[in-house]
Amino acid sequence: MVSRHVLEAEQVEDISMDQNPLRALWAADKPAVNGWLSMPSAVSGEIMANAGWDTLTVDMQHGMVDYQTAVSLMQACATRDVTPLVRVPWNEPGIIMKSLDAGALGVICPMVNTRAEAEALVSSCRYYPKGARSFGPLRANMRYGPGYAANANKEILVIPMIETREAVANLDDILSVPGVDALYVGPADLGLSYGYEPKGDRDEPELLEVIDHILAVAKKHGKYCGIHCGAPSYARKMFEKGFRLATIQTDAMILMNAAKAAVKATKEGGGDDGGAIY
């Protein structure tokens, strides 16, 4: 159930499609700190929206999130000035278009390995004549106003994930597709593709070299690059390298880590930050 607070926020917030806020950040050469919504709860989404993230990504691939929950999470994002993105489960036109109709301002798509796959992704995100997106943005129109249709093609962000050897080999082809705005590095699958264990915050010299190469090729094409991180300190290192979006863990892992720390501090002492109960 969507909270009354969420519904009220949708009625009073006035956001236009004149410029995607994430595009505005990047145009100013500022990095975006991205949160990751994997829990199927509008309340947890609302909590995350109030935490100060620049962007929040609804994870429909590995998160416990179906389409109806994704809509609720984007409504939760509307309670604060946070830009909603979505990681779709696959490069499939139907779910991409429905996610955009629900109000996502950017699509992160997994396992884009070739130029043809990047072209298909762009086509699903763009209205004619730049793509094949079907028109029917019911919630997006309500959220962003009458200028949505006119501005969607230039403001919606198209972000293929780079997470295989094949994708790395095809970086120039993928980045040369008109309409691709940025890349997003998936470090766990990227590591698997090179024979390493799946994890975030890669520290293996070979993979660090690959990540640097991805960033360099993106910059060569005038595109931005994001990456999924675990520790905030690692995210800051990525910003220093030139990444312009970094995800910190997931909502579930943030909750788990905070809960563990609170239990440990209570049982063993130390780490008491104080604060309100509610």
Describe the predicted segments one by one:
Residues 6, 12-278:
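Expand to "…catalyze enediolate/carbanion chemistry for C-C bond making/breaking, isomerization
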